[in-house]
Amino acid sequence: MGGQCRHLPESELDIMLVVWGARGAVSAPDILAGLARPLTASALHSYLKRLEEKGFLTCEKVGKVNWYTPRISQKAYQEQEGKSVLDKLYAGSLKRFAAALYDGGALDAREIDELRRYLDELEGGVK
């Protein structure tokens, strides 16, 4: 799919989260069952087609069933979206981003310790 994937609207991201969570090929009825918000089968079909066109999914028809698999990993998408948010909202500054999380109450002492340990591991060359 290339090095850059596109940002997904919330409805398409919800579908991709179900597909990524399946850890293999998944059918439309399985996707519908996995969605938190109700969606009609025809609306889901439109979203799936769009995700195929954007290069996020592949579809293989087996008998009468379409099986969908991701073409981009959840990790790759998360990395791209994280970098995009960091660049757009915090001018690429991780310090500003962490400060916003802390000031907004999204980071507690345990999470700060986890982040500190992770950064120490990165500095030590361990991943």
Regions found by a protein language model. Give the residues of each.
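Short acidic, hydrophobic short linear motifs in intrinsically disordered regions
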Residues: 25-35
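Glycine-centered, phosphate/nucleic-acid-interacting loop/turn motifs that mediate DNA/RNA or nucleotide
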Residues: 55
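Short capping segments at the starts of secondary-structure elements
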Residues: 8, 21-27
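Short amphipathic alpha-helical elements of helix-turn-helix/winged-helix folds
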Residues: 14, 18-22, 34
